[in-house]
């Protein structure tokens, strides 16, 4: 799916709600790949739901119950980057033309009718409940290009209900007879580039705190101020200046 706005252009693949390339005035802003003929490098450009990073040991405890999720990184024994990275999302477009009565739209038809390129597209996926993650989610990822501000990606997930396990299956996601809220995290995995050596790039992150992770479980271990640490990027500095 190709998007354009001003000098910006992007391509999105439905598998994994993946950003395939992003360019401005012909210059790559992320490392591109050919989604039609090649597999990406790792999780390149993909949407990571319902967790980013690694679940150590491919197991986690939530609401007093332990759940096992598929291990897809054998070298670390971890469950990496969620459950939707290789799933095929459905396309919905609200850029041009009216919404399809069935809730889906053919992007090519919409663009042809509008006689102009698309500037945004929304991809949707229903993630069914499973034993390792017994919550059903409706996931929506919107990619929107603007001629001034560039690319905005908005990911929304709705918990449409926890699946109560059968009596012979332990670990039903219930507490005091009520379904627990779904544990959830989200991230994206683009590989940024500016056609210059990484160490020369200036990085600015307007964050006052950093989230530490437990080295054994990789679970969040609390936040701390970045001031006085190597994690303070608020003023912007060259990547090569940090250890």
Give residue ranges: language-model regions.
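Beta-strand-rich N-terminal accessory domains
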Residues: 1-74
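Residues that act as N-cap/strand-start positions at coil-to-secondary-structure junctions
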Residues: 6, 16, 54, 83-85, ...
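Acidic/His-leaning functional-site neighborhoods
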Residues: 8, 78-92, 229-243
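Acidic, contiguous internal or C-terminal segments within carbohydrate-active enzymes
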Residues: 10, 125-167, 171, 178-184, ...
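Structured soluble/peripheral alpha/beta segments that form catalytic or ligand/cofactor-binding pockets
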Residues: 63, 70, 74, 79-80, ...
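Extended, loop-rich substrate-binding clefts of extracytoplasmic carbohydrate-active enzymes
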Residues: 72-100, 108-148
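Intrinsically disordered, low-complexity terminal tails and inter-domain linkers enriched
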Residues: 95-118, 159-180, 212
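Active-site/ligand-binding surface loops and adjacent short beta/alpha elements
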Residues: 163-168, 174, 179, 183, ...
């Amino acid at each position: 799916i190709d998007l354009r706005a001003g000098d910006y252009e992007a391509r999105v693949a439905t598998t994994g709600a993946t950003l395939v390339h992003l360019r401005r005035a012909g210059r790559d802003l992320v490392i591109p790949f050919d989604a039609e003929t090649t597999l990406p490098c790792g999780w390149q450009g993909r949407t990571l739901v319902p967790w980013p990073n690694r679940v150590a040991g491919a197991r986690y405890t939530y609401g007093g119950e332990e759940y096992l999720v598929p291990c897809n990184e054998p070298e670390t024994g971890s469950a990496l980057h969620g459950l939707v990275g290789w799933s095929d999302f459905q396309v919905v477009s609200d850029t041009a033309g009216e919404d399809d009565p069935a809730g889906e739209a053919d992007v090519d038809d919409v663009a042809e009718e509008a006689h102009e390129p698309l500037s945004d597209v929304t991809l949707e996926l229903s993630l069914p409940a499973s034993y390792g993650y017994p919550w059903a989610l409706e996931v929506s990822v919107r990619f929107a290009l603007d001629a001034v501000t560039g690319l905005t990606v908005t990911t929304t997930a709705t918990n449409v209900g926890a699946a109560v396990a059968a009596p012979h299956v332990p670990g039903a996601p219930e507490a005091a007879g009520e379904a627990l809220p779904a544990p959830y995290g989200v991230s994206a995995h683009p590989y940024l580039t500016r056609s210059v050596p990484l160490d020369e790039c200036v990085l600015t992150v307007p964050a006052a705190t950093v989230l530490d992770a437990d080295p054994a479980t990789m679970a969040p271990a609390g936040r701390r101020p970045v001031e006085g640490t190597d994690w303070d990027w608020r003023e912007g500095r060259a990547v090569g200046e940090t250890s």
